[in-house]
Amino acid sequence: MGQEKHVFTIDWAGRTLTVETGQLAKQANGAVMIRYGDTAVLSTATASKEPKPLDFFPLTVNYEERLYAVGKIPGGFIKREGRPSEKAVLASRLIDRPIRPLFADGFRNEVQVISIVMSVDQNCSSEMAAMFGSSLALSVSDIPFEGPIAGVTVGRIDDQFIINPTVDQLEKSDINLVVAGTKDAINMVEAGADEVPEEIMLEAIMFGHEEIKRLIAFQEEIVAAVGKEKSEIKLFEIDEELNEKVKALAEEDLLKAIQVHEKHAREDAINEVKNAVVAKFEDEEHDEDTIKQVKQILSKLVKNEVRRLITEEKVRPDGRGVDQIRPLSSEVGLLPRTHGSGLFTRGQTQALSVCTLGALGDVQILDGLGVEESKRFMHHYNFPQFSVGETGPMRGPGRREIGHGALGERALEPVIPSEKDFPYTVRLVSEVLESNGSTSQASICASTLAMMDAGVPIKAPVAGIAMGLVKSGEHYTVLTDIQGMEDALGDMDFKVAGTEKGVTALQMDIKIEGLSREILEEALQQAKKGRMEILNSMLATLSESRKELSRYAPKILTMTINPDKIRDVIGPSGKQINKIIEETGVKIDIEQDGTIFISSTDESGNQKAKKIIEDLVREVEVGQLYLGKVKRIEKFGAFVEIFSGKDGLVHISELALERVGKVEDVVKIGDEILVKVTEIDKQGRVNLSRKAVLREEKEKEEQQS
């Protein structure tokens, strides 16, 4: 590949996609600048020259956000980008998943794929540009890669599918689907949907694949024009003679160990066989490389036997049928001082979710490359080491935790009531207490129960299930409710969440090159059957959301004022609103349209704050009577507060029917007197009269007599 710049263009969903090579980052194995509309992403691929002594493929995919891409300077003291945002982590995972299966078995060279987002047009997805660029950077490089792949976003408005919808279109769409794959098959799906039937989700996936084929053909043209010749890289291979020797020693005992039904007992039985074989080779004083190979052969034997049993004999490690779900149980209200809690157990997978309700001021503020500035619904997922019976450091959430939390959030968001109907911020935290596969889906089930226990009026309960696949040649078996071993040794992890009516979230990862429409269809239908079974079990525990919120949850009172009066409530430099908060102990959130949300665990505090605000924004009406309090006395009259924050002057001549020599002869500070508004002058000053009230009372008495 020469040093000169090459430019290639294609139309992508009504916007121009431009690829530039040969100018930037020329020392990387492969580099491309992707311009999609005004979005610009630099994608690079680099590989180590020598393989690493590892038993896995060391691939790293990074999606790097730069705030200059949207004309922002980072906040804080340091003024530079810090740790990746949640969106960047999710985008990195999104790109990694379709690329990873397309490297040869035994490839051990370290590969790093980096996409730097340099300019963002909100209507031209930087994630899709980065996925395209990552595939192309690998394809034009000398790194052995069995791609290319491409990905698209699919939306649906008025029953019509749309490729790469704009921000406005996505708001109207009932599907937000990212699908990726090769020209032959789909190998990654990530979707959120508003209770959309399985058949429509499948059609959306296949619709996206047609566009993917076109993008891959475009990549192949570029590779033919500027691609480097692929390097000859030595793949890790097992010694065949050693393989046969280990197989003869271990195969029979491993077959028995694999079929032990209980997880820990099975792991112990498998490890016992492995340790005995390794010890035999160590006694024969083989070198370290040979011992390492023996361990890898043993792991491969376990994998092959598990897969053979499932595909040929339809026998799963724990003895279940292929479409059988593990025993289910659930419970609510475990934690008395929280706003809502739900425990969901499926076999040896267990999640405890806690729901916390907050004021609208508790929303999460987002400062990234997107248009969204805040969100009022959050789902966080924690996976401590004790859940698998192990020790380990307690760190912040990693990519996996962030990804699983986001999947749960996507699954539950369509059933969260609107801000108008339920003016609360909702935070869910899922604590995984036991893990044997499908913890993300258990957290969705537990979170649904926690919200129902908290009294959140969700539109419908949501359940999730993980489907698996074992494929051997043309033969395949779809598994319902996969456990940890089936996830690790199988070909697919297909998570489906939804309500009785339809799908709310999909996530599919595979370890083979792709899946056909037939397999996807079977997996979706089998998942629906399993989801209904789980929903019925959950509803037996709690059939609907509680009618009352927890007494520990904040009570929110909503009122509306004239938007022009917002400044009166806030006061100069926030002085007035802070005074109300201090006096009443409430939280106050004000919308631009004049809607005010007052929240507190004490209802009397809410009412007190409401009364103060009503007084602040009340309009003084000429001719109206008010019971006011004397606040200040001057020689010329008394200043009377007719309601909070509003004073008027009763001139000395308007204090009584008779002539008054001294104001103090009639009123003193603190007296409550009934006054009438006689005038509001051009400067907004209010003139009051006590005389007018007394005159009216006298006339009324005379009429009655």
Swiss-Prot record:
This is Polyribonucleotide nucleotidyltransferase. One of its GO terms (molecular function) is polyribonucleotide nucleotidyltransferase activity. It is an enzyme of class 2 (transferase). SMART domains: KH, S1. It is found in: Cytoplasm. Belongs to the polyribonucleotide nucleotidyltransferase family. Residues 623-691 form the S1 motif domain. Involved in mRNA degradation. Catalyzes the phosphorolysis of single-stranded polyribonucleotides processively in the 3'- to 5'-direction. Necessary for competence development in Bacillus subtilis. May be necessary for modification of the srfA transcript (stabilization or translation activation). Involved in processing precursor type I toxin-antitoxin RNAs antitoxin SR4 and SR5 RNAs to their mature forms. The gene is pnp. One of its GO terms (cellular component) is cytosol. Its EC number is 2.7.7.8. Residues 554-613 form the KH domain. GO terms for biological process: establishment of competence for transformation; mRNA catabolic process; RNA catabolic process; RNA processing. Its cofactor is Mg(2+). Homodimer. Component of a possible RNA degradosome complex composed of rny, rnjA, rnjB, pnp, pfkA and eno (although rnjA and rnjB's presence is unclear). RNA helicase CshA may also be a member of this complex. It comes from Bacillus subtilis (strain 168). Its main location: cytoplasm. Pfam families: KH_1, PNPase, RNase_PH, RNase_PH_C, S1. It catalyses: RNA(n+1) + phosphate = RNA(n) + a ribonucleoside 5'-diphosphate. Keywords: Competence, Cytoplasm, Magnesium, Metal-binding, Nucleotidyltransferase, RNA-binding, Transferase. Disruption phenotype: Not essential, doubling time increased slightly. About 800-fold less compentent for plasmid transformation, no effect on sporulation efficiency. Grows poorly at 18 degrees Celsius. Increased sensitivity to several translation inhibiting antibiotics such as tetracycline, erythromycin and chloramphenicol, but increased resistance to streptomycin and nalidixic acid. Forms long filamentous cells, probably due to defective septum formation, cell walls are altered with looser, less dense peptidoglycan. Double pnp-rny mutants grow very slowly, while pnp-rnjA mutants could not be isolated. Mg(2+) binds at residues 487, 493.
